[in-house]
Curated annotation (Swiss-Prot):
This is Dephospho-CoA kinase. Keywords: ATP-binding, Coenzyme A biosynthesis, Cytoplasm, Kinase, Nucleotide-binding, Transferase. It is an enzyme of class 2 (transferase). InterPro entries: Depp_CoAkinase, P-loop_NTPase. Pathway: Cofactor biosynthesis; coenzyme A biosynthesis; CoA from (R)-pantothenate: step 5/5. Its EC number is 2.7.1.24. SUPFAM superfamilies: P-loop containing nucleoside triphosphate hydrolases. GO terms for cellular component: cytoplasm. One of its GO terms (biological process) is coenzyme A biosynthetic process. PROSITE patterns: DPCK (PS51219). ATP binds at residues 16-21. It comes from Chlorobium luteolum (strain DSM 273 / BCRC 81028 / 2530). GO terms for molecular function: ATP binding; dephospho-CoA kinase activity. NCBIfam families: dephospho-CoA kinase.
């Protein structure tokens, strides 16, 4: 059967795992990259339905205007609330992620038209939304918990306690690993991760050439 889209790859992992760095390497090697979290952030200040939903969850004053007139969203406030109330986090994800996935499917069509062979979606949550089953291949980036906490703190994502709370709300890493088609262990430095990315890229090229009928644990 002739494919109607590029080979679709998901890259996921918990906070501080290094999935973004891995994806940057894959992009430089020739993959096209779709950043789900970046698209979600854009939709939060541009999509009327999502904006109304966010106002319902967090109050109208969660949005404000900057001096230049640009719409601003109080993301720190949202983060405090969702990571203290798991039900609110679930409601926010249900509001945003279907539209993020629609944007990904549209990108896949456009990428196919450009002749893109491999389209990578970087996403903080993938199995959790049920979208992993729609992909041809899923990569999980894993790392030791303390290493992940240090990385997240260094990036300014919160205090160690904040990061621990966020990790506690995410799927356990072992659950992600058990469902992956490929696991990158990232308790290593950037140079080693680049080498791992090179090996992964070779696997993806071979899998893309063989088609989507891989031995996936999700099927």
């Amino acid at each position: 059967m002739t494919p109607s889209h590029p080979f679709l790859v998901g890259v996921t992992g918990g906070i501080g795992s290094g999935k973004s760095t891995l994806c940057r390497f894959l992009e430089k090697m020739g993959c096209e990259l779709f950043e789900a979290d970046k698209v979600a952030r854009q939709l939060q200040v541009s999509d009327p339905e999502i904006m109304e939903g966010i106002k319902s969850l967090f109050g109208k004053d969660v949005y404000s205007k900057t001096r230049s007139g640009k719409l601003s969203l109080d993301r720190k406030r949202i983060a405090r609330e969702v990571f203290s109330h798991p039900a609110t986090l679930g409601a926010l994800n249900n509001l945003i992620h279907p539209k993020v996935y629609n944007a990904f499917r549209q990108r896949a069509l456009e990428a196919f038209g450009r002749g893109t062979a491999i389209l990578v979606m970087e996403a903080a949550i993938l199995f959790e939304t049920g979208r992993a089953a729609d992909l041809d291949f899923v990569v999980v980036v894993a790392a030791d918990t303390e290493t992940r906490i240090k990385r997240a703190v260094t990036r300014g994502l919160g205090t160690p306690e904040d990061i621990r709370k966020r990790i506690a709300l995410q799927w356990p890493q072992e659950m992600l690993v058990a469902r992956a088609d490929y696991v990158v262990n990232n308790d290593i430095g950037k140079t080693k991760l680049k080498e791992e990315a090179g090996r992964l890229y070779s696997v993806l090229v071979e899998a893309a050439a063989s088609g989507p009928d891989c031995q996936s644990k999700r099927r």
